Amino acid sequence: MTERFENLFARLAQRREGAFVPFVNLCDPDPETSLAVLETLVASGADALELGIPFSDPCADGPVVEASADRALANGATPARCLDVLRRFRTTHPETPVCLMLYINLVATPGVRRFMQAAADAGADAVLIPDLPTSMREAEPEWDEAAREAGLHLVAIVPPNASDERVARIAGLTSGYTYLLSRVGITGTDHASGTPAERIIRDLERAKPRPPCSASASPRPDTSGARSKRAPQASSWAPPS
């Protein structure tokens, strides 16, 4: 299992700082530009990266991320080409933690074990699958087994309306970090959920999972700073999607 995320969070915890973990789609608009974007993000202070693999039916994404995926796909983006961009990035950035974010079809089609190993070989540290339900991970252990065998973290998502019982279940599954949604629904809107982030973070702390990373795809990037203070080990921001 890679230790890049663990080492990053340990350093940040000592300084009581949150991580800046931006999200971008790989191969948008093409592999060369995509690689340059990753280089620029790290040079501009990104502590880690969440990298999307474009999909034709991004059910959880808003218009900006969907348009990004469409551009990449129109120029021939495939999972293999995306992993090649990551592989090239890794040659010059061996210490930057990277989580791949993609939809379940892109993992299931080649086979869970085959994909997980390919992702690890390309240099990924973690995989986040937004449409992989907690119940499926519990019923089909192949998902977690394949990730562990490849040396990858399989990150779990905590929705803002999660009950205490559900938070505990998710905390028992997640690896690497815990992805805390800041709102219910399609990303890129600016509507707060009814559940205060502080309550979810307290529940996570009681369950003692991996560090929470609060996802902020809000039109207001300043919201990430506030969440970082509530979840000091990790916080992230992405452009409105």
What does each model-found stretch correspond to?
Residues 31-43, 162-173, 208-209, 218-235:
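Catalytic cores of alpha/beta
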Residues 46-56, 125-136, 178-189, 230-241:
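Glycine-rich phosphate-binding active-site loops on the catalytic face of alpha/beta enzymes
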Residues 92-133:
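Hydrophobic alpha-helical segments and helix pairs
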Residues 179-182, 188-234, 240:
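Active-site/ligand-binding-proximal alpha/beta "capping" segment
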Residues 22, 41, 49-52, 119, ...:
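Conserved, mostly hydrophobic/aromatic
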Residues 2-12, 31, 56-67, 74-89, ...:
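Active-site-adjacent beta->alpha loops and helix N-cap segments on the catalytic face
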Residues 10-14, 43, 87-94, 120-121, ...:
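Acidic (Asp/Glu)-rich catalytic clusters
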Residues 20-24, 49-51, 98-102, 127-129, ...:
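Hydrophobic faces of well-ordered beta-strands that scaffold small-molecule active sites
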